Amino acid sequence: MSGNGNAAATAEENSPKMRVIRVGTRKSQLARIQTDSVVATLKASYPGLQFEIIAMSTTGDKILDTALSKIGEKSLFTKELEHALEKNEVDLVVHSLKDLPTVLPPGFTIGAICKRENPHDAVVFHPKFVGKTLETLPEKSVVGTSSLRRAAQLQRKFPHLEFRSIRGNLNTRLRKLDEQQEFSAIILATAGLQRMGWHNRVGQILHPEECMYAVGQGALGVEVRAKDQDILDLVGVLHDPETLLRCIAERAFLRHLEGGCSVPVAVHTAMKDGQLYLTGGVWSLDGSDSIQETMQATIHVPAQHEDGPEDDPQLVGITARNIPRGPQLAAQNLGISLANLLLSKGAKNILDVARQLNDAH
């Protein structure tokens, strides 16, 4: 009898209710805020589980004197976190989706994509230029951005401005803007500013005609071990179906173009009346040469937790077992079709030249 009692006690200790789920994140304040929001949602869904947040620095956090596009290494903000995932030191990792490459290392998958916040870019102005827009900034004003995508589009749109690289986390960039006289304004992701509670610093939100956004911008991705079915089931509740389908289309477009950090590629997606609209573009580094096109596809946005595919093969690095396969494939095909259209119009040449120029500098 006593033996059975011990077995029952052991089973209770090993039951999922007692389990601590370890969540990996970057150390920056924004990353911690984003991770806290994901953990809060998981806690609400699984009140019996405990969650421990483990923060670590990544290569991208450490190399702050070089433009991201020049470092010449993929997975700048993800490699150390993936290493911890691989060694079973954490069970899942919360990322900004735009930091996750469209091809993940073997053994990993994006197990959830959370509801997207505003994906557009924002302009934050130096205190002396508050009330201005990019259009009304004085001639030769210097605007800071760490992104080739932003610089290429904005140089084309605002030729009277000069664009220079600015690195560091959000706090560091804002301090550089406010305390030094080098920059009249800087460009940042609206979602990051909003998550930090800095709505009052948003001086201008850039519309798609001015600057399309990065693939996955404004959404959070939760990376897990691809074979860890328990954790895949656990994080599945975080999937937002519309965000998922938009981001599958965007990531398929980028992957098929073979774009990345070192080339200016941008997108804009919208879901309306059962249609998914995808606009994508590529630019030369100075913005003088560009190709942009829009395509659409009829896609039914499923309700969360309709029964999805059981075999769960990944699409552009994403596993969404609780979302039907048909809409996911339709979104992926839309991204591939748009990429093929741009490639047929000469996108590869623009991107190759951009890559060579970026590598040469």
From Swiss-Prot:
Residues bearing PTM N6-acetyllysine: K74
One term under GO cellular component: cytosol
Effect of substituting E250A: In AIP; severely decreased hydroxymethylbilane synthase activity
InterPro entries named among the record's database cross-references: HemC, Porphobilin_deaminase_cofac_BS, Porphobilin_deaminase_N, Porphobilinogen_deaminase_C, Porphobilinogen_deaminase_C_sf
Consequence of substituting Q217H: In AIP; severely decreased hydroxymethylbilane synthase activity
N-acetylserine: residues carrying this PTM: S2
CDD domains: PBP2_HuPBGD_like
Effect after changing C247R: In AIP; severely decreased hydroxymethylbilane synthase activity
SUPFAM superfamilies documented for this protein: Periplasmic binding protein-like II, Porphobilinogen deaminase (hydroxymethylbilane synthase), C-terminal domain
Impact noted for substituting R195C: In AIP; severely decreased, if any, hydroxymethylbilane synthase activity
The protein's assembly and partners: Monomer.
Name the UniProt record assigns to this protein: Porphobilinogen deaminase
Protein's gene: HMBS
